UniProtKB/Swiss-Prot annotation:
Gene it is expressed from: UVH1
Species lineage: Eukaryota, Viridiplantae, Streptophyta, Embryophyta, Tracheophyta
Disordered: annotated segments: 343-363, 516-593, 697-718
Enzyme Commission identifier(s): 3.1.-.-
Protein name (Swiss-Prot/TrEMBL): DNA repair endonuclease UVH1
Subcellular location, record wording: Nucleus
Record flagged with keyword DNA-binding: yes
Length: 956
């Protein structure tokens, strides 16, 4: 059932024939709105194109799902695999299609699409549009050729529409739109409809453990200290530097947007603080999302990877983070105390000798005993997540209510559906499935044993320090506080060494025990019985090693495969499916005394699938609160007012989880309030709808050389300018430079080039490199080959190094530049490249617009490039002749190509061979010793010599 505010939005969009920009609150079914507009589209109006960016793939799947649920034909996607004639027929069919901006812009420039047959274009990611984006390039061309085509842009991220200066106004200008439609959650029509039949909501606040409270407090203290340090730089807007804003990913964007232009002037300490704030935000998130052992794994990974460079590791409160995280998992006790306690009663936790001397190990009921006389032992604590117990209680309560309704013979058809549990990510889904299928303590024990095994692997990877790293003065110290024992040297202290040895002993014992159990069990690994009538099963995530399968059967680990080394949650593999269902007949494997559970389906919020319309659950447990999903629940209940729906929200009381959820709602409301104010005062030009554009118009025109022409020359008349054109490689349309060149009035000719990225004239070829691509090309050696090909076929080969406009115009800060010439330094690599290719010219560009100005200057005294000739460059003809080969004037190119294909000859040594040998015949007469000197090794020289001396096979 379509909601009334949905119908109102659709009618508002259809009223304006030119289109408009729709900004909707997150979770208010943007996909359903777009699907409704596609269903209302008539083929007689013309073809409708939906620009599909990589970030809009989940939105595309939702649109297709909603259209197919109404038995309407779903739009197909136009891909590059389709031939040009087939794409042309699709463009003229009048149906809606998904298409990527790169394919569409190339077809527009090559005139493979009849623009007059287009009814309109949908922009699915309006919040990511800028003046230089490919989508803006497309709209400008379409509007110049077909001013009646409508443009409708959509976004459900209002926060992104207010980031930066006049973001909304610039977006509307780039899309040639004059009308904006704002539909926040607090809009009267929306709030009334969603609150008319609200679901039954149960808000459960779970108290965090004392250690979790201590860790959260310590992280916030460290984060606050880092923010205070950043404020001292006087280079960041202090209003944005708050702990609350630091809880969101957008905080990184805010800080980097301010610091990127001056990034090369910042010291190492400030740069590290930016990275540390991102790490601390992850710690706050992982604290409430994952179990105690996984959190400790991630901390250990940080301690190894970040080393002395991190400032936050040396803060006074950081010790509490590591200490409390350890106490949630294990504690160290004296071996003498363990021995005395074992005389009184058996301990359920495992004891391990710090020296690794285990007199007896018994594996009975999950218990082990270690007889030791000295040292310390590791005693398991394995604190369970407080939410786990609450989740199981809710499931048991739900099943009891359903049984009562069944006995009372009430109509409970709506209450027998699947219980949906919404989690943040796939890893949480898998772990919660294990918890309700098995004993939570068993799950924690599996994680604990994997953690111990990872300790062994981590120790084998560590290399001894050859030389102590010299730390810059004041670097790694926060607020002037230096810890008594640094984390890097913690293993060197007495207590730290004892703890490390105790963990190694425990890990070794588990490793030995796992091998013994694996040998005893052999191939007999029974799986628990699964009753598929009581649950549905999605595709589960792969286990990191085969150890988990062994643990499922005997609760012990094997060591046949490598244990997990990087235990951070972001390193977990994601499942291909959107969600995971459980339990696998929880009643068959549930612990004794546990109650029966209803069928449960775990849903990962990050998958962004229309799970509510597919499963139609009657009970939903929001394990990880998310604002967008809460709105989806409201819309789902409003669309199904007669269906009973009970929603449980599980929060950690007084945690950053609650603070982040409430702040996300507040930030969205503030964004809409800002948009409403902007809309009331927004000045929109009358011709912004594109109706006044000519066929050859563009937003900018290059300065004419005849602007200052003398009046005595032909009465002051300006000579007719010849249209400048640039040949652009197809792959370059992933960047924004072709768009900017088109804005400058240049004609863009997209072709597939074998040599170069941009052809400015018959003699000028340009290879464009962004900073990241430049480093990668040097590493792979691709740049050397590209420059070699340009030098071979063009008189003026040019390497364009293009910086981002909002970042620093520098490779590195002045303090990082050393006097030493090293082969790994980027400046050294560029110097060697220029020395090797003397005709190569380097261009340094500050931004896209600066590049366009440089191209205009370079083309001022040059002829226009020939498209046909540029396509043939580097491509051999049927006779094997390559046109415009400059190297052929001095070298026999056929002989050179033959030489490079000989065994042992590579790009690194064929030039030295050419300098020594004048012909292939002379090369064949050289002895192995001389070849070894030329080729840089005896092995490659021997392979070439054997090839040259090989006998020619004959049939006689």
């Amino acid at each position: 059932m379509a909601l009334k505010y949905h119908q109102q939005i659709i009618s508002d969009l259809l009223e304006d024939s030119n289109g408009g920009l729709l900004i909707l609150s997150s979770g208010l079914s943007l996909a359903k709105l777009i699907a409704s507009l596609l269903i209302l589209h008539s083929p007689s109006q013309g073809t409708l194109l939906l620009l599909l960016s990589p970030a809009a793939q989940s939105l595309k799947s939702r649109i297709i799902h909603y259209i197919s649920s109404l038995d309407s034909p779903t739009p197909t996607e136009i891909t590059a695999d389709l031939p040009a004639n087939q794409r042309y027929s699709l463009y003229t069919s009048g149906s809606p299609f998904f298409i990527t901006p790169r394919i569409l812009i190339v077809d527009l420039l090559t005139q493979r699409i009849p623009v007059s047959s287009l009814a309109g274009i949908f922009i699915l990611n309006a919040h990511s549009i800028s003046e230089t984006s490919t989508e803006a390039f497309i709209i400008r061309i379409v509007k110049s050729l077909n001013s009646s085509a409508y443009i409708r842009a959509f976004s459900d991220r209002p926060q992104a529409m207010v980031s930066g200066f006049a973001k909304t106004e610039r977006t509307m200008r780039a899309l040639f739109l004059r009308k904006i439609h704002l539909w926040p959650r607090f809009q009267l029509d929306v709030s009334q409809e969603l609150e008319r039949e609200p679901p039954e909501v149960v808000d459960i606040r779970v108290s965090m453990s004392n250690y979790m409270v201590g860790i959260q407090k310590a992280i916030i203290e460290v984060m606050d200290a880092c923010l205070k340090e950043m404020k001292k730089t006087n280079k960041v807007d202090v209003d944005d530097l708050t702990v609350e804003s630091g809880l969101f990913k957008s905080f990184d964007e805010i800080v980097r947007r301010q610091l990127d232009p001056i990034w090369h002037t910042l010291g190492k300490r400030t740069k590290q603080l930016v990275s540390d704030l991102k790490t601390l935000r992850k710690l706050l998130d992982y604290l409430v999302r994952y179990d105690a052992v996984s959190f400790l794994k991630f901390l250990d990974t940080l301690r190894v990877s970040e080393s002395y460079r991190s400032v936050w590791l040396f803060a006074e409160s950081s010790y509490k983070i590591f200490d409390f995280a350890k106490k949630r998992v294990y504690r160290l006790v004296k071996a003498s105390d363990v021995k005395s306690k074992e005389h009184v009663k058996n301990k359920s936790g495992k004891k391990r000798n710090s020296k690794g001397e285990t007199d007896s190990v018994e594996a009975v009921g999950g218990e082990t005993a270690t007889n030791v006389a000295t040292g310390v032992v590791v005693e398991e604590v394995l604190e369970e997540a407080p939410k786990w117990k609450v989740l199981r209680e809710i499931l048991e309560e739900t099943q009891e209510e359903r049984l009562k309704q069944a006995f009372s013979e009430e109509d409970n058809s709506d209450n027998n559906g699947i219980v949906l549990v919404a989690c943040k990510d796939e890893r949480s889904c898998m772990q919660l499935e294990d918890c309700i299928t098995n004993n939570p303590q068993k799950v924690m024990r599996e994680e604990w044993e994997m953690y111990l095994l990872s300790k062994i692997e981590l120790r084998s990877m560590q290399t001894p320090q050859k030389k102590k790293q010299k730390t810059p003065k004041g670097f790694g110290i926060l607020d002037g506080v230096v810890p008594v024992t640094t984390i890097q040297n913690s293993e060197g202290s007495s207590v730290g060494r004892q703890e490390h040895e105790a963990l190694m002993a425990a890990a070794s014992s588990i490793r030995k025990l796992g091998k013994t159990t694996d040998m005893a069990s052999g191939n007999n690994n029974p799986e628990p019985h699964v009753d598929k009538a009581s649950c549905t099963k999605g595709k589960a995530k792969k286990d990191p090693t085969s150890l988990r399968r062994s643990l499922r059967s005997c609760n012990k680990k094997t060591t046949n495969s490598k244990p997990e080394i990087l235990p951070g949650p972001e390193n977990e593999e994601k499942a291909n499916e959107a969600s995971t269902s459980a339990p696998q007949e929880a009643n068959a494997v549930r612990p004794s005394g546990a109650k029966k559970l209803p069928p449960v389906h775990f849903y990962a919020l990050e998958s962004d699938q229309p799970i509510l319309d597919i499963l139609k659950p009657s009970v939903i447990i929001v394990y990880h609160p998310d604002m967008g999903f809460v709105r989806e629940l409201e819309v789902y209940k409003a669309e199904n007012p007669l269906r009973k729906l009970k929603v449980y929200f599980i929060f950690y009381d007084e945690s950053t989880e609650v603070q982040k959820f409430e702040a996300s709602i507040r930030r969205e409301n503030e964004a809409f309030e800002s948009l409403i104010r902007q809309k009331s005062s927004m000045i929109i030009p009358v011709d912004q709808d594109g109706l006044c554009m000519g066929s050859n118009s563009s937003t900018e025109f290059p300065a004419s050389s005849t602007q200052n022409s003398l009046t005595r020359k032909a009465g002051g008349r300006k000579e007719l300018e010849k249209e400048t054109q640039v040949i652009v490689d197809m792959r370059e349309f992933m960047s924004s430079l072709p768009n900017v060149l088109h804005q400058k009035g240049m004609k863009i000719i997209p072709v597939t080039l074998e040599v170069g990225d941009y052809i400015l004239s018959p003699s000028i070829c340009v290879e464009r490199k962004s900073i990241q691509d430049l480093f990668q090309s040097f590493t792979s050696g691709r740049l050397f080959h590209q420059v070699e090909m340009m030098s071979r076929y063009y008189r003026i080969p040019v390497l364009l190094i293009e910086f981002s406009q909002d970042k620093s115009f520098s490779f590195q800060s002045s303090s990082d530049i050393s006097d030493d010439v090293t082969p790994y330094n980027i400046i050294s690599k560029l110097s060697l490249l220029v020395l090797h290719f003397p005709r190569l010219r380097l261009l340094w560009s500050r931004s896209l617009h600066a590049t366009a100005e440089i191209f205009t200057t370079l083309k001022s005294n040059q002829d226009e490039p020939d498209e046909t000739r540029a396509i043939r460059v580097g491509v051999p003809s049927e006779e094997g002749i390559i046109e415009n080969d400059i190297r052929a004037e001095n070298y026999n190119t056929s002989a050179v190509e033959f030489l490079r294909r000989l065994p042992g000859v590579s790009d690194a040594n064929y030039r030295s061979i050419m300098e020594k040998c004048k012909s292939l015949a002379e090369l064949a007469s050289l002895p192995v010793e001389t070849l070894a000197e030329l080729m840089g090794g005896h092995k490659v020289a021997k392979s070439l010599r054997e090839f040259l001396d090989a006998k020619y096979p004959t049939l006689l």
